[in-house]
């Protein structure tokens, strides 16, 4: 009976399950309507199609598997993007606080941070969103609806990587301030190393949540390759031509 299918859907939902229902007949309409995701077949009745959220035009259940794979992969890519952004923010925030404690001027200028934000908000989104879906996500258990997108593993990764980056940059800043003296060349080196750390962090983000190396099928990730090249080229242009606007001076090997 149609009500039996609907009761099953309601019972599963009460237990916190995310329920998807497929159907092609009029009697499937109540279950399709009450499910979180209703999937009707292209050859089904108009009643079933109207009650569903989407229609499988090719009547192929493999399309459902592909949709789940893409959904899980997109969720993971969003986690990677959040990880990348928060690592940059944690590092920059601690550097500003640390720099004020040792009495140095702002280690990063406003225009330099605008370039870093462009890397974070635009280029990183392009690179990480363009990563292809991974087959290994289908082996994972379904997430609970109450799960926070930043899980414990990601939170620890953000803290550890952010502190490592801060420790390296703060040590460099302290050396320039107390030993070598802060000059335009030193500040340019500091800024470039900071950007290169975020450039490398894209590889950390790519491998986040995966058992595979960040270099797995590296050459096939054209979107990531393009973004990595743009960041390198942009940083080179800023160092060579930025001048007073970016508080940079051209660097050579001796510097």
Each model region followed by its residue ranges:
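Basic, alpha-helical nucleic-acid-binding regions used in initiation and control of genome expression
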Residues: 32
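Extracellular/periplasmic helix-loop-helix junctions in multi-pass membrane proteins
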Residues: 179-182, 240-255
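Hydrophobic alpha-helical transmembrane segments in multi-pass integral membrane proteins
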Residues: 165-174, 229-245
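Hydrophobic alpha-helical membrane segments
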Residues: 196, 201, 223-238
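Conserved Rossmann-like nucleotide-cofactor binding loop
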Residues: 27
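C-terminal membrane-solvent junction of multi-pass transporters and transport-like membrane proteins
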Residues: 149-150, 154, 209-230
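Membrane-embedded transport module
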Residues: 2-20, 35, 42-210
């Amino acid at each position: 009976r149609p009500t039996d299918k609907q009761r099953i859907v309601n019972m599963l939902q009460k237990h916190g399950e995310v329920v998807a229902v497929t159907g092609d007949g009029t009697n499937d309409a109540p279950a399709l309507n009450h499910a979180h995701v209703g999937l009707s077949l292209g050859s089904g009745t108009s009643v079933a199609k109207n009650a569903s959220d989407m229609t499988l035009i090719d009547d192929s259940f493999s399309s459902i598997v592909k949709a789940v794979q893409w959904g899980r992969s997109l969720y993971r890519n969003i986690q990677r993007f959040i990880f990348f952004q928060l690592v940059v923010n944690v590092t920059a925030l601690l550097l500003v606080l640390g720099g004020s404690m040792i009495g140095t001027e702002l280690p990063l200028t406003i225009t330099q941070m605008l370039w870093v934000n462009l890397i974070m908000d635009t280029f990183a989104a392009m690179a990480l969103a363009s990563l292809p879906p991974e087959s290994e996500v289908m082996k994972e258990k379904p997430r609970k609806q109450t799960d926070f997108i930043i899980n414990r593993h990601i939170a620890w990764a953000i803290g550890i990587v952010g502190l490592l980056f801060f420790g390296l940059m703060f040590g460099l800043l302290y050396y320039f301030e107390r030993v070598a003296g802060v000059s335009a060349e030193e500040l340019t080196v500091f800024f470039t190393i900071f950007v290169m750390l975020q450039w490398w962090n894209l590889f950390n983000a790519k491998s986040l949540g995966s058992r595979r190396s960040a270099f797995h099928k590296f050459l096939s990730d054209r979107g990531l390759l393009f973004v990595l090249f743009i960041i390198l080229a942009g940083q080179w242009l800023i160092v060579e031509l930025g001048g007073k606007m970016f508080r940079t001076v051209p660097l050579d090997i001796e510097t």
